[in-house]
Amino acid sequence: LYISGEESASQVRLRAERINAIDPKLWLASETDLGAVITHIDEVKPQLLIIDSIQTIGSSAADGALGGVTQVREVAGALIRICKDRDITLLLVGHVTKDGSIAGPRMLEHIVDVVLQFEGERHSRLRLIRAIKNRFGASDEVGCFDLSDTGIESVLDPTGLFTSRHAEPVPGTCVTVTLEGRRPLLAEIQALVSQGRENDFGNARRVTSG
């Protein structure tokens, strides 16, 4: 059961059709009220419940604005209790702040078993999933994925995304090994030096990109 609080059911269906993710066992609802979400749970009796996102679901039993600390705490607590009683796997999608922490109450990280962070640069197809917390295994694992027109696909060897192939060595380039969690990655570093007159460029500058 997939509960979307940010997009309508028709919008989510269009995305699912584009990446060929329609399945007869997948139930979809667009709700922002906790009571309506519980009603769908009672009707569908799912094995997996996805809430997208926790900040968009509100409860009449709690005060405060939608997405606020009080609302997020109440909604998350109620859903976790229901899922534990009915043996349902719960996946909460949440927003993060600019510093990378989970938006809303910090207690969300303490009441869940696993925290996965999905990140990537705006102009790159590469996406990383980092395990911030994992009660069932290592918390320094990193998964690499390619964001394509057909969806998000796993990348077993992401070296090709960070390096370019040359028949002969190219001046100004080198390949280094960087460690993302416990996963070593090969990355290519390219250096470009430009010589100019002081009146044209002013003081020398060092600029990095990537």
PLM features per residue range, with description:
Residues 12, 52, 79, 94, ...:
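Residue-level signature of catalytic and energy-coupling elements of molecular machines
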Residues 16-17, 101-111:
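Short regulatory helix/loop adjacent to the ATP-binding pocket of P-loop NTPases
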Residues 42-49, 55-57, 120-209:
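Conserved P-loop NTPase
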Residues 2-6, 31, 47, 65, ...:
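Conserved phosphate/pyrophosphate-binding and hydrolysis machinery centered on Walker-type P-loop NTPases
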Residues 24, 87-88, 110-114, 127, ...:
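Short glycine-/polar-rich loops that comprise or flank the Walker A/P-loop
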Residues 1-81:
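Conserved inter-motif catalytic segment of the P-loop NTP-binding fold
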